[in-house]
Amino acid sequence: MIEQPRICVQVQSIYVETQSIPEEERFVFAYTVTVRNLGRSNVQLLGRYWLITNSNGRQTEVQGEGVIGEQPLILPGNEFQYTSGAVLETPLGTMEGHYEMIDHLGQAFRTVIPVFRLAIPALIH
């Protein structure tokens, strides 16, 4: 039996007030993702899929190769961290998705990106 690679994904988001224009329904958020390889062999992140939902229920799907122009190889016990951004029409929303990855044998697998919130500070309780 082939062991499924153990990958941990953590995300932190912040509101970027200096780039946002609330009166024009433009709310900019930055998020930092940390992908940790908790397994015993190398893995490589090849692609991403995001489902972005604003507080009106409008959903946008984003998919593509790699992240921030890279397809990082993550060694056992190591992590890859990057920061990216999203623009919403509402001050509150969520993101979730998955990464398309391969293990050291070239076997494809998906790693879930848990849902996280995008919110301006006044809406966080």
From Swiss-Prot:
One of its GO terms (biological process) is error-free translesion synthesis. Residues 1-125 form the ApaG domain. Disulfide bonds: none annotated. This is Protein ApaG. It comes from Yersinia pseudotuberculosis serotype O:1b (strain IP 31758). The lineage of its organism: Bacteria, Pseudomonadati, Pseudomonadota, Gammaproteobacteria, Enterobacterales.
